[in-house]
Amino acid sequence: MLDTNEAIYRQYETLGISKEVLDFGTSVEKELKDRFDKIDTNAEYNQLKVIAAMQKNKVSAECFQASSGYGYNDLGRDTLERVYADCFGAEDALVRPQITCGTHALALALMSNLRPGDELLSPVGKPYDTLEEVIGIRPSKGSLAEYGITYAQVDLLPDGEFDYDGIKKAINEKTKLVTIQRSKGYATRPTLSVKRIGELIAFVKSIKPDVICMVDNCYGEFVEDTEPIQVGADMMVGSLIKNPGGGLAPIGGYIVGKKECVENAAYRLTSPGLGKEVGASLGVIQSFYQGFFLAPTVVSGALKGAIFAAKIYEKLGFKVVPDGTESRHDIIQAVEFNNRDAMIAFCEGIQAAAPIDSYVTPEPWAMPGYDSDVIMAAGAFVQGSSIELSADGPVKPPYAVYFQGGLTWYHAKLGILMSLQKLYERNLVKLD
């Protein structure tokens, strides 16, 4: 039988990782032991938090039964929503397979809690590209702008801090809802910590106490030991094919928060008079529970992968956001290559490391909702899942790629090493 380390080296070699790349990665990994230990501690806390919420709400095998048709009296669906509310510190929750993605969840939360004549304010700069059409920044059918809902935006200061003076000036009698995007999206600004989100919410409510503060929590669940609801957010929104689905949920989104806000969203999702009472869970409810149970552990692996990627590419001279030493507040790692070929090579490496479609070569394409070609690498069990190992980005300067996910740390590690291998083979990096 082979020595364990030798066997691992040979397995990496079988997968196409050279000794030079593996040695470089191993030296970086050794530097990260203390940070990895802290990630494990956070995962343990969040795992216990999820279990406590499940036990409090008496989750049973009956909860896994599929419902169909109207979905009246769906025990599993209703119990899961109480689990989400308790785990995230909210009054109520809407967790449904009928919410198709994160953008849908955000659109639902906005459209159900805003009325013609209201104004939406983003105090953290431009939102995700896909939200531009929801809001009406880029004209689109059914946007908020078409319904007479206006939009205001205050950019972050050059150092990434909130522009408190600008925010104060922007809040007016029409300001009904403030949207706070936690993650950076396709930008290189810092991701917001829960603490900073709490400070921003407190400032906004000191000016206008009745304003609704909504946090787009995509990519942020279970990264810290607290969530935005616990620091004053009225609504928190996310996708089940990101962190809270644990890689098992095949579809879905959630909205948690104040009861009135969640009820408004439920009536918009279904219809007035029906709200949360309808909406069959079909055959996915067990995967929703099991994915949520596994989510803290899955997120910990994704975090390790993000830090590993940052450290490796920082050592090679690339700009990385966050850098290799910063605290983490989401699972996304941005690497600026300033080179189209390097960006594409990175994505090819992520795809080549996948268990699914590893033989496919990703290419830039005109993805709906974006104003430039986008390249995506994602050999995932669930199409579009970004808690699974994936990388993507708009193919335009500074040619920044956004890496995230990995259902296990070891798969995330392989993906990063494979990305490095592709760059190394094409003489786009030197490992000296």
Each language-model region and where it sits:
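Solvent-exposed, charged/polar functional surfaces in cytosolic regulatory/catalytic domains
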Residues: 83
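Conserved PLP-enzyme active-site core in the AAT-like
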Residues: 2-29, 33, 40, 50-56, ...
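Short glycine-rich or small-residue beta-strand-to-loop segments that form or flank ligand, phosphate
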Residues: 63, 67-68, 94-97, 331-336
